[in-house]
Amino acid sequence: MPQVSIVVPIYNVERYLSYCLDTLRAQTLRDIEIICVNDGSPDHSAAIAEAHASLDKRIRVINKPNGGLSSARNAGINAARGDYLMFVDSDDYLAEEACESVVSAFESNNADIVTFGAHCVPQKSNNDWLDCVLSPRDRVYREFTEDLLFAESSRPFAWRTAVRKQFIDAHELRFDESVPFGEDQVFHFDIYPLARTTALISDKLYYYRLSRKDSLMSTFANSSKWRVPKHIDIVGAILTHWDERGLMDLCPVRLMDWILDFLCYDLFRLSIDQQKECLAKLGSILESHFEDAVTTANTIFPVMGDIVRTSIELANGSRHDIPRSLARNYTRFRIGLLAMVRDWLRRLFSKDEEGHVEDELENLTERLESEEALGNSLVKLIAQTKSQAYLPQVNNTRSAR
C-alpha cells in the first residue's frame, strides 16, 4: 500500500495537466499513488492523463460522467489505498518535497490532519487576504478549539490540507456534492472539529495558479450578486452538518461572528431587493440551526443582533423592509474597527523583535475603551489575547477570514 494517495480531479485542463503530473511524479517520496479523476472533461485532458499513466505505474485514471469537483474528489477518495490523502487541482502543482514533508508531519505528531502553506503563481497575488490564508504558522492542536477554525490560517482551500484516510473513513467524511461552489470551506468545517490532532506547518508546499479569466473562480471573485447567494448556501451546508453531528454548542458566538463577517460586507453592496432576498434566506437558515440566533448575534455586538433579527423577520414575513440604519451601522462597526486594528498592527510590526508589545496592547485597549460601543467585546478580546500569550508572528501568521 502507498503512503500517500494524491487525488487529482481533471476537467478542461489540457494546458496545465502535464506539468502538474510531472511535479507529482518527481516527488522525493516515491511511495505514492496518483489518482487522476477525469470528470467527463470534453478536451484532451483524459488522453494526457492516460499517456502519463503509461509511463508511471503509480498513476491510475478513473473516468466518470461530469459531476463537479466534489464528486470527482469523492471518487478519488473512494479509490485511494494510501495511508494519507492529498488533493491537487490539475492546473496547480506541488513542491518536490511536498509529500515527504506532509508524511513527516503526520508521523511526528500522530496527526489526523496536516495543513500547510502555499505559493501563488505568479508570485504576487495583490490580495492580502489570500496571502494571509496561505501562510499558516507552525502549531499543533491536540484537541479541537475554536481558534483552529477562526484564528489560524487553516481555511478554505482543501488542496493545502492532507488527511489521514482512516480518519475520514471512520467519520464518513466526504465533500458535499450538493454544494456546487465553496465545498472546500464546508469540508474544513466538517473535519477540524472531529480530529484528535491537527498539525499546521508553515512550509509552502503547494503552487496555486491564480484563476483564469474564464474560470468559475474568476466569475465568483468579481460578482457580489453571484457570490452572496453561494456564500449563504455554504453557511447552510456547514450548519446542517454541524447540527447533524451535534456540534452546534461548540462555539456558537464565534460561529455566528464568522457567518456575519463572511456575508455582510458583500450583502450590503447589493440592491435593496437583493438584500431582502438574501437576508430572508439567511434568516431562515439561522433560525433553523441556532437555539437563539438573535441573542447569539447580539453577544458579538448590537448591530449583529439587529442584522439577524431583521433577517428572521424577513424570513417569517413579519417585516418587509430593511432599516435604513442597518448597513450604515454595520459598516461603522466593521470598517472603523478594521482601520483601528490595522493602524495598531502596522505600528506593532514595524518594531524590532524586542518591541514593546505589551505597551501596544495597553494602548489599543485604551482606545477601544474610549469607544464605549466597542469596549465590551473588544477589550475582552485583547485580554484573552494577552492571557493566551499569543501574538501573530510577522512572517507567517495571519487570521483566516
Report residues per predicted region.
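Short beta-strand/loop segment that forms part of the nucleotide-sugar
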Residues: D31-G40, R60-P65, D89-S90
